[in-house]
Regions:
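Active-site hotspot residues in diverse enzymes, especially metal/ion-binding acidic/histidine motifs
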Residues: 1-197
Length: 197
């Protein structure tokens, strides 16, 4: 498993988005999957209870299988979108490794999980998370929306932004910003750290 830098993963996510989407947000990851990539999204009851996984992508690149019970509620839509983007991260970043294991169902995925060394699996998952974050939260749009939300925050609270610790400010901003991108606040907080540098 090659180590990929954050910059390499960011570039891969940006290239993927440019190829399959446009500059609008939120990125319609379901449309990309079903229309552009012609993959099926298959809901599997009990996937999380039986195998402790939210979703997996098959090695044939024909399906993304998702836990039905976990994602049937509308409140999980943002998490679902992130899971889709995460699985696409495996397609883009780990295609060769996935193809070697021939993952076609949850049992195959469990075998894959058992056979890949723990640190290597952790690298893959971390890389797919980073990919999903960059895919769904383009930093140029994040920068502009952050400015807009900060202006609203200043107006509403009559406060000087420079007086607030950047990490605390990110926590305040993450909720309002997340609505623009169709993700939960946590990935926004992570993405905002890139703008604090």
């Amino acid at each position: 498993m090659p180590f990929l830098t954050k910059g390499e993963i960011s570039t891969a996510a940006d290239l993927f988005r440019k190829k399959y989407w446009n500059d609008t947000i939120p990125v319609d990851i379901e449309k990309i999957i079903s229309v552009n990539l012609r993959m099926d999204i298959v809901f599997k009851p009990g996937l999380f209870k039986l195998f402790n996984i939210d979703a997996y992508i098959t090695s044939s690149w024909q399906q993304i299988c998702v836990d039905y019970d976990l994602f049937e509620a509308d409140k999980n839509n943002n998490r679902l979108r992130f899971s889709y983007a995460h699985e696409i991260g495996h397609l883009v970043l780990h295609k060769n490794l996935y193809e070697q294991f021939g993952i076609s169902d949850a049992d195959d995925f469990n075998r894959f999980y058992d056979e890949v060394p723990g640190d290597q699996y952790h690298f893959m998952e971390t890389q797919a998370h980073i990919f999903a974050n960059f895919l769904l939260i383009p930093r140029s749009q994040l920068y502009e929306i952050r400015k807009k939300v900060i202006d609203q925050f200043i107006s509403a609270n009559q406060i000087e932004i420079a007086e607030i610790d950047p990490k605390i400010l990110n926590q305040y901003l993450a909720g309002p910003i997340s609505k623009y991108f169709g993700v939960s606040p946590t990935p926004i907080e992570i993405a905002l750290l890139d703008l604090n540098k």
